[in-house]
Structure formats: C-alpha cells, structure tokens
Swiss-Prot record:
Pfam families: GlutR_N. Keywords: NADP, Oxidoreductase, Porphyrin biosynthesis. One of its GO terms (molecular function) is NADP binding. NADP(+) binds at G181, Y182, S183, D184, I185, N186. Homodimer. Belongs to the glutamyl-tRNA reductase family. The lineage of its organism: Bacteria, Pseudomonadati, Chlamydiota, Chlamydiia, Chlamydiales. This is Glutamyl-tRNA reductase. PANTHER family: GLUTAMYL-TRNA REDUCTASE 1, CHLOROPLASTIC (PTHR43120:SF1). It comes from Chlamydia caviae (strain ATCC VR-813 / DSM 19441 / 03DC25 / GPIC) (Chlamydophila caviae). The record marks H92 as: Important for activity.
Amino acid sequence: MVLGVVGISYREAALKEREAAINILKDFEANTLFSQRFFGGEGSFVLLLTCHRAEIYYFSKSNHNVQSELLSRISALGARPYCYQGLACFTHLFTVTSGMDSLISGETEIQGQVKRAYIKAKTDRELPFALHFLFQKALKEGKDFRSQVSLSHPVVTIESVVEQTLDLHGKSTKDKLLFIGYSDINRKVANGLSAKGYRNLIFCSRKNISIPYATVARSQLSFREPYDVIFFGSSESAKDFPGLSLENLASISNRVIFDFNVPRTFTLMERPKDIVCLDMDFISEQVQKKLQISKQCTNKEKPFLALAARKQWEVYEKKCSHISSSQLQTSRPKLLIL
C-alpha cells in the first residue's frame, strides 16, 4: 500500500510549468477509467491546485510505481517535482495546510483551499480511508496550529504588492477598479485597497450574492468600459468571456491588468504597448524580493507540525493494522464442528 504526494510549487517551477502540470493532473479527473487503472482497485487521489502549487495526493494498494510514473510525467515538462510518502506525506500536508509552506508564510487562505480540494474529491469519487484520514487530520491540525501558535502579521502581503504596483504605474484612489470573480484573493486585495482609500471598486461575479461593493452583471460586462485596473480572480478562462480580446483590453490606455488565475485567464504572445499585464509569476517574484529584504524567519514553528504529523501517522498505522486484521478475519473460512 502506498500513500503519497507528488507536486510542484512556486519554488520548483515557473507559472508556465505549473500550468502544464495542472493540465496533466486534471486528466485524472477527466478520465475516470484511466485513473482507476492508474491507481488500481480501491486507489484514488485528491488534487490540490492553487496559485502557487499543483499537487496530487494518492493512495494505491497495487501500483507501487505510481510515484515514479507521476514524477516522470511532471519532470517531462522541465520542472523538478517533489515527492513524499508515508510519514513524510503527512508532515508535508500538515505544513502546507498550516500556511507554513506558503509563499507568504502563515497565510490563512490555504486552509480553505485544502478543505475545498478534499470536499471536491470526496464528492466526485469514492476515497479510501487513507485519504480521508490524511486530509481530515491535516485540516484539524492546521486549525489547531493557528490557535496555539502566535504568528506575527505577514511582513509582506499580496495586497501590499498590488498597492505598490499601482503606485508605480501612476494609479490613484480615484481610479475605477474592476474585480472579476468574488474569490478569496480578489476580496483580500479589494479590502486592502479600500483600507488605503480606494473607493471606486466594482465586482463582476457569476454568483448573485450581496457584497459590500458596487457590482456589474456578467451580461453587462464590457472590457471597453473605462476601467483603469482589472483583476481576474475567478476560475474561468478566456472563452467564458465573449468580449475578452487584446483589442478590447487595450481600448483603455495605461490600463493595468492583474491575472491571479492559474492557469492564466489568457496568455499574450507579445507584450502589448498600451497596457500592463501582470500574472502570478510577477506577484511571486515581488513577494520573494520583499521577503529577502525583511529576512522573515519561519522555521521555528515547523517542529510543532512535524510532531503533530508523527502522532497522527502513528494513529493511522494502528488503524490500518486493525482494519487489515479485521479484513483478514472476515475473509477466513469458518470451521465447521462436526
């Protein structure tokens, strides 16, 4: 039996390679028969896909070559994936869920992303005990970690990078800002800019929800409207926006566009002259530069997570041993007393 993870993050791969890895991993969701053959009977997987990481957590009873095959597929993209099994897999997911492996150490969004990835997987397909246990305990320990360990407010945030970038491009608090998608990252950036005096914030979402900002209906969305800054932060691609084209985006000169999506909403073959397009690679580079300057240290909390992971791993091993013994007993033929 093999319980493990294979993946890449912003450390091992640029945005282009992460996008390609996401497409490869999504094939397991798109092709049920293929994934069943790949992981074998009673095997399954959970995909954790975020702006900064693409990971597949898997369990397989029969295919002991799963790890090497996954590594080969992702390595073919030119990336250098990491892999962990058993206790190391537990420790990795616990560290990820706590936010201590994030680009911005201690950020809280990852807890929700891990939870949504787990819920999606168990809704879409049957998961084995191993994956249920791994994710449930990671979510529990991640929550406990935040309640027990005092983390200082991040020195660098995505909001601060966005604000500084807008300043560099001559944007003011009077400019008109459009947020496409009511996602975590869009809300966080909007809240940060609002606190800095930006008031002309407009959201466009597929969902009909009540929010503390002005809104524009999707049917009325036009990229020729005088939006000075546009933030793409939904899970949609370019084909979901009928009016999305380079011509329309460039219809407002000096427009700044942030594409927070991975894979990107759109890719440009050449750099446009009249607009500025920035993606998550840009955000990552800026954050890492600022972190190097601030010399933020976060390693001191990791032993806490390693200890929690070992404790839950030992519980998992005991439960697996008990399950195996029970299955063995039920599979033995009963002796007839003559």
